[in-house]
Amino acid sequence: MLYAVFFYVRYGVSYRDLEEIMAERGVDVDHATLNRWVVKYAPQIAANAQAKKKPTASSWRMDETYIRVRGKWTYLYRAVDRDGQTLEFMLAENRDTASARRFFKRAIGTNGVPERIVIDKSGANLAGLQSINVILKFTGVGRIIGIVQSKYLNNIVEQDHRFIKRITRPMLGFKAFHSAAATLAEIETAHMIRKGQLGQQGIPAFKQFVALAG
């Protein structure tokens, strides 16, 4: 079943198409069962990937992209470093200061405090990051994050969005927020493996993915 999950989040097919692909290989799996497996393993796989990923640079690029859930747009917040290595991701129902602040706290929690973050011209992202700097200042962390607003410098993360969107497009949207978040976590993890972020060159991507499931 983990092979089906990996195939789904790595290559971008619909649940129905994956049923047919697996049936051709003699494996009987329905889309409801596959969805349960995606949701079941997502937290563990994503957490283990974060724990095992190689060190990243202290200059970040942050942006968000749109994901359709229940026929409505939600927002996938994403950050990569200057080399395009994935740092963190978070699906949110709203694109506002609170969501941006929550994302920055989460990214810092898993990657430490960066020297600077490049964002777009979004006022919500700016306000969210400024509020993080206030917290850093008054907690005595010793480093205030440099803020750069530049669409041009954010090309790295915008280009990185394309891989995620290429995988999600054939999925034709998600029916529930929690399953969307779980699926995206595994898509991001498969993307990290593809970029070699787990430092296991020579090991097949599927084996790396299965190892993260425990």
Q: Can you say where each PLM-predicted feature lies in the sequence?
A:
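Residue-level recognition of single "structural anchor" positions
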Residues: 1-214
